[in-house]
Amino acid sequence: MTKLWGGRFQKETDRLVEDFHSSISFDRRLYKYDIRGSIAHARMLGKAGIIPPEEARAIADGLQEVLADIEAGRAGFSVEAEDIHMNVEQLLTAKVGEVGKKLHTARSRNDQVALDIRMYLKDEIDQITGLLRELQAALLDLAEKHTGTVMPGYTHLQRAQPVTLAHHLLAYCQMFRRDEERLADCRRRTDVMPLGAGALAGTTFPLDREYVAEQLGFAAVAENSLDAVSDRDFAVEFAAAASLIMVHLSRFCEEIVLWSSAEFAFIELDDAYSTGSSMMPQKKNPDVAELIRGKCGRVFGDLQALLTMLKGLPLAYNKDLQEDKEALFDAVDTVKKCLLVFKPMLETMQVKKERMAEAARGGFTNATDLADYLVRKGLPFRQAHEAVGKAVLYCLERGRSLDRLSLDELRQFSPLVEEDVYEAIDISRCVEARRVTGGPAPGAVLEAVKKARQRLRERP
């Protein structure tokens, strides 16, 4: 096959090099963006008088036919044509003849691929943002049902203070909200049109770059041709944002794995989101949660691949940049798959309220409330802390809990204790007393849910 760049060469490319060099096996997914960009470029060439308007129309019409053929499965791609750009151009030329060879006027594959990736990533960011918003809405729905479901809050994976399941779920809602904001920020920097930068130094033709940007829905035009063809910061930013999404999913999945175990027994996952063992008949495994947790490493690896690829590249374009796509595509695919399966797994899990409440009543999660009670009675906090610590030790030695001690026993640790102490250390009331903004009290949680729903409605 004659290469589109073959004029300077006297020998055919070695078959091993063709296979090694070709990217069509993975960049084929960019075909829609490549064709859309080429149609806008062709129309601009005609509008600017760089090629006759009738030829521009013929090229644009031919590209529409190529798109239809690809989507109908009537057109195939070849390794010999190297990449999606040259495959599309050859398919176009086969349809419209020699005029198709004018499409690449004032354009390089360097600015062409930068355009394709940016268009692709903008669309994918929009899709992932939609999935994040759906997940936040599901979390809010679940939280609203569990404002009174008391459970232990943990530090160091040891029971610390009582909270509610609703409050716990809202913590993740905050994380996914930040993820959404990071993606929006990344999209803003992705929304820059590089076409017209040429190979690296622009072109002598009178291009109307602003027209192309408008046709393709870009907010801005790249201001430096060297940067336009070599910039992959936006891909790194996306992979970093995707990594944080995966961190948040992984943390949640770790808790789901723990909570579904017999040792915690806080939840039971639906059969549809669990698997069994080929040997042990009794097993019900949280494989979906474990897989999401495991896939976190893939996206971290994609981020590292992009950073490592870029770290030693001189300006402007280098073939190393071909390696950006598989890492970027994998990060996109992995995050989308994980978000798609995580939401229904969460929505269908059974919450064991009594077991959560029982766990909250154990582990002295009301110890801080007893200390606060003594502070309100006039004891300095440090002294209150020490007194309650001794009370906890007393309970541990006797297999008791604080709320099961008699008034006389409690007064051994502070004479300030009165009969109202039992109200202060009741687990449900401990939660209800934390009415501070952002706290776990049911009223505070419902207010947080209301604000979160409002934010979801306001964001486009």
Curated annotation (Swiss-Prot):
GO terms for cellular component: cytosol. Belongs to the lyase 1 family. Argininosuccinate lyase subfamily. It catalyses: 2-(N(omega)-L-arginino)succinate = fumarate + L-arginine. The gene is argH. SUPFAM superfamilies: L-aspartase-like (SSF48557). Its EC number is 4.3.2.1. Pathway: Amino-acid biosynthesis; L-arginine biosynthesis; L-arginine from L-ornithine and carbamoyl phosphate: step 3/3. It comes from the Bacteria. GO terms for biological process: arginine biosynthetic process via ornithine; L-arginine biosynthetic process. It is found in: Cytoplasm. PROSITE patterns: FUMARATE_LYASES. This is Argininosuccinate lyase. Disulfide bonds: none annotated. Keywords: Amino-acid biosynthesis, Arginine biosynthesis, Cytoplasm, Lyase. GO terms for molecular function: argininosuccinate lyase activity.
